[in-house]
């Protein structure tokens, strides 16, 4: 049996629309508090997308303390989930049809993502994906925070010997 492990952001879900919204929220508030001048660094974020959120904030806010970076991260997470739940994002064309075909053919489908669990859950529930996905795994499910290790763990847990990582 062939198994499929998909990434969520940038593979199934078009993240840019919700990212821009959430980043704008964070940097708007930083500007209001006098902690940031200039535009929201969306282009820089898009260049590093896929790294862990602590790495994101260390890159976007290098002069900020760890506590300030963590506060920005909490606000970003809240804003991102709200944007997803409000329908500001979208799946790539054909996503639901592909997942439905795979499921109908009996192929197990998993998600392995750098996203955190509540964010991934918001996408799955908002866009009706639960029917097609056997399990959603977050980078937070593995102590190392390494996505390759997460995929290896999924393969071991489900005794996967044949499949695709997309």
Where are these regions (language model features)?
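A general structural motif
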Residues: 1, 106, 160-162
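N-terminal helical cap/lid subdomain that shapes the substrate entry/recognition surface
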Residues: 2-93
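Hydrophobic "anchor" residues on beta-strands that sit immediately upstream
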Residues: 3-5, 110, 163-164
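Conserved phosphate-coupling serine/threonine residues in phosphotransfer and NTP-handling enzymes
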Residues: 11, 113-115
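Short, acidic loop-to-helix structural element flanking the phosphoryl-transfer center
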Residues: 82-111, 121, 148-152
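Substrate-recognition "cap/lid" segment bordering the active-site pocket of phosphatases
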Residues: 116-165
